[in-house]
């Protein structure tokens, strides 16, 4: 089985490859078993993302652990996890087609 952090890196690359992200627009997170979330960092191109760049955020305290800052939209992810116990991952992107449809 592929380790979760590597799966997140690969998911970011798939967003870029599918033209759903220019590389820096959007973020990914996965719920951890211990009340935390593993999140992509702020302002880092998915093409440059490594497993070491991911940030662990405690959903209760908001405390972040990692060498980078978490996505500025981490609270959006936290709210999704709070409201939906059945949700274990969030993909938030600003792809050109979805953005055009929203306008």
Features from the language model and the residues they span:
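An anion-binding catalytic pocket shared by soluble metabolic enzymes
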Residues: 2-91, 98
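Class I SAM-dependent methyltransferase SAM-binding "motif I" and its flanking Rossmann-like core
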Residues: 96-103
């Amino acid at each position: 089985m592929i380790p979760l952090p590597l799966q997140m890196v690969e998911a970011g690359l798939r967003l870029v490859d599918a033209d759903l992200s220019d590389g820096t627009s959007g973020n990914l997170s996965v719920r951890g078993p211990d009340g935390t979330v593993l999140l992509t960092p702020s302002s880092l191109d998915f093409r440059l993302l490594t497993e070491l760049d991911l940030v662990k955020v405690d959903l209760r305290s908001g405390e972040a652990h990692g060498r980078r800052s978490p996505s500025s939209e981490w609270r959006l992810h936290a709210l999704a996890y709070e409201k939906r116990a059945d949700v274990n991952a969030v993909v938030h992107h600003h792809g050109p087609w979805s953005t055009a449809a929203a306008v």
